[in-house]
């Protein structure tokens, strides 16, 4: 009896020591040590409320924001109130907004159970619907889509809260005579992906989204052209460098996933060569370059099995090969160094210096998703160029490493998610956050006055734009927290959107491991007794 009690005491001490060491290794966040992915998920969804345009709802949680853009579209005789500001300015750019909704919807569709278990189901649905409601509004006719509200040049000349803005709210559209296959295709993808998310909770709304998605895809495919050729004002901000081929394939594959209709898959197969789907082997995934994402969607079709004609199977296999090229590039396992993504000494994937964090967060999402697809299909490895192999566990580990880098596991010890951890950017390049809230001081702030009084001040922003992921450090892991350093301190909606899925997944994994450890501990104690 004494021996048994001694053993029990030893086990108890061991458990306490293990718990203490885990907490010390992390930041004592309440998740049992390490990073608090649940808090990061919560903050990420909160960020979208800071970016809202239009009439804010009664349950708005970001209280320093107010109604804005209430006359958007009025000059053109259309209702374009609502949607999201993409970053730290007050323009509504349709292409990155639609991409944000696609990624947020993909995250929700892929990690629905994990998001719900973290208590964020309602918030993710609200974040998606705020964007898709606007995208539906912007699609005013079968072959007409409003792609921008506001003018980047005049907007950037001023530093004003959204609630005060006096800059141009001119709206710009694409139509038959002024095509925009890229923005039409991305908007179709966003609405198709969102229709999957709302299928159970709001079936009528889901069908509405799908109807608009199908019309937009048909419009974009029938009247081809780059939207920045039709809307010159967007070129300096969101030029479509990759063209529209990736968006058309992306939209077709999302419509296939949403409807199950063979015709959309036939399109993705038939147009694979012409639109670059099986020709482009890329090392980045972003609001502009969608090839890696669509290649992964096509690979998923193949991995799910089914009776595919030989020609279909061969093309889908080409898609999978290109998808795995991207994933191997993130791991640095392709044979040619130029075929891999550069990595900083601190471990961050590095593509380019302007808002590099968008490439990091998108990579983390695609790595996470594909590791799950491998597991679900019974596979375990992918083949990289040159013959090297990589496992699903390696993909997942790289995804987690990038997520942890974002949250503070980096040489600077800085969380690049605003409001998370002890050290995070305090001078985010964000008009609304950098100026006193209109609720605290309702006095009008003029265009140039905002620069003089708020932009150039050295202190921290008066409002914390929690959940925003800023552009992040350079290729040497260096970061300068200054409002004028927009390449590093400006946050964008498409930086945070993919991390909603990643953080939900990592939190679920952490909780599952914690439960397993607790069960093992209880089992050990029972054996001792």
UniProtKB/Swiss-Prot annotation:
GO terms for biological process: cell wall organization; cellulose catabolic process. It comes from Oryza sativa subsp. japonica (Rice). The active site is at residues 89, 429, 481, 490. InterPro entries: 6-hairpin_glycosidase_sf (IPR008928), 6hp_glycosidase-like_sf (IPR012341), Glyco_hydro_9 (IPR001701), Glyco_hydro_9_His_AS (IPR018221). It is an enzyme of class 3 (hydrolase). This is Endoglucanase 21. GO terms for molecular function: cellulase activity. PROSITE patterns: GH9_1 (PS60032), GH9_2 (PS00592).
């Amino acid at each position: 009896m004494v021996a048994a009690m001694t053993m029990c005491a030893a086990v108890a001490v061991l458990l306490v020591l293990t718990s203490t060491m885990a907490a010390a290794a992390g930041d004592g966040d309440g998740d049992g040590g390490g990073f608090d992915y649940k808090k990061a998920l919560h903050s990420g969804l909160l960020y979208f409320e800071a970016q809202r345009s239009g009439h804010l709802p009664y349950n708005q949680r970001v209280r320093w924001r107010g109604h804005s853009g209430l006359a958007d579209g009025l000059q053109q005789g259309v209702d374009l109130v609502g949607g999201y500001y993409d970053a730290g300015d007050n323009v509504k750019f349709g292409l990155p907004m639609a991409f944000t909704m696609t990624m947020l919807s993909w995250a929700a569709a892929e990690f629905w159970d994990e998001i719900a278990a973290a208590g964020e189901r309602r918030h993710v649905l609200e974040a998606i619907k705020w964007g898709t409601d606007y995208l539906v509004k912007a699609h005013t006719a079968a072959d007409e889509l409003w792609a921008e509200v506001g003018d980047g040049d005049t907007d950037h000349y001023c530093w004003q809260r959204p609630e005060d803005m006096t800059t141009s709210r001119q709206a710009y559209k694409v139509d038959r005579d002024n095509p925009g296959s890229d923005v039409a295709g991305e908007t179709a993808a966003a609405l198709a992906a969102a229709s999957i998310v709302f299928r159970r909770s709001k079936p009528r709304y889901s069908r509405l989204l799908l109807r608009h998605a199908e019309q937009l895809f048909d419009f974009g495919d029938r009247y081809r052209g780059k939207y920045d050729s039709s809307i010159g004002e967007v070129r300096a901000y969101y030029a479509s460098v990759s063209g529209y081929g990736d968006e058309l394939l992306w939209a077709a594959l999302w419509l296939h996933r949403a409807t199950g209709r063979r015709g959309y898959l036939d399109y993705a197969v038939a147009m694979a060569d012409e639109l670059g789907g099986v020709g482009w082997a890329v090392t980045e995934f972003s609001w502009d370059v969608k090839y890696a994402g669509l290649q992964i969607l096509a690979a998923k079709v193949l991995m799910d099995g089914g009776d595919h004609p030989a020609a279909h199977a061969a093309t889908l296999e080409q898609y999978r090969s290109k998808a795995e090229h991207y994933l191997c590039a993130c791991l640095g396992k392709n044979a040619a160094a130029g075929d891999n993504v550069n990595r900083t000494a601190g471990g961050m994937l590095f593509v380019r210096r302007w808002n590099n964090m968008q490439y990091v967060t998108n990579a983390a999402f695609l790595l996470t998703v594909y590791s799950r697809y491998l597991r679900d299909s019974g596979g375990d490895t992918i083949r990289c160029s040159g013959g090297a192999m990589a496992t699903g566990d390696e993909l997942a580990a790289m995804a987690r490493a990038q997520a942890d880098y974002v949250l503070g596991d980096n040489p600077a010890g800085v969380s690049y998610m605003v409001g998370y951890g002890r050290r995070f950017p305090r001078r985010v390049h964000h008009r609304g956050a950098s100026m006193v809230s209109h609720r605290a001081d309702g006095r009008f702030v003029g265009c140039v006055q905002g620069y003089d009084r708020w932009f150039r001040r050295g202190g921290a922003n008066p409002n914390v734009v929690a959940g925003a992921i800023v552009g992040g450090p350079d290729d040497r892991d260096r970061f300068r927290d200054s409002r004028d350093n927009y390449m590093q301190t400006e946050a964008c909606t498409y930086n945070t959107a993919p991390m909603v899925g990643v953080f939900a997944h990592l939190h679920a994994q952490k909780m599952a491991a914690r439960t397993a450890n607790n069960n093992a501990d209880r089992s050990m104690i029972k054996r001792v007794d």
